[in-house]
Amino acid sequence: MSMDDPPGFSLPPFKPEEALLTLKRGLRDLGLVEREGRFERRDRVIARAAVDGALLHAARVKRPSRTSPEWTEKPLRSAADVRDFIADLKKQLAQWSDRDD
């Protein structure tokens, strides 16, 4: 038995459908608008998310673009992954200037 695994303690199971709702709420809080499974700001796609079995697949653009954006994919397997994705996107949104929007 190690200190990492205390007896009688286990993380709650990951529920991707509930995590998707949490992610959507977090992205709306960042000022993004949801359209057809994608999240936009000023008519430019910024992020997308979809449930695939036991995983939540999320992606964000490397830079905002009206044409075909480059995506950075990230599978979300836990509530912590969802929080990290939202926090990372928040930092990225702050770094992009208005001319990139």
Predicted regions and their residues:
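Charge-dense, helix-prone N-terminal extensions
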Residues: M1-D101
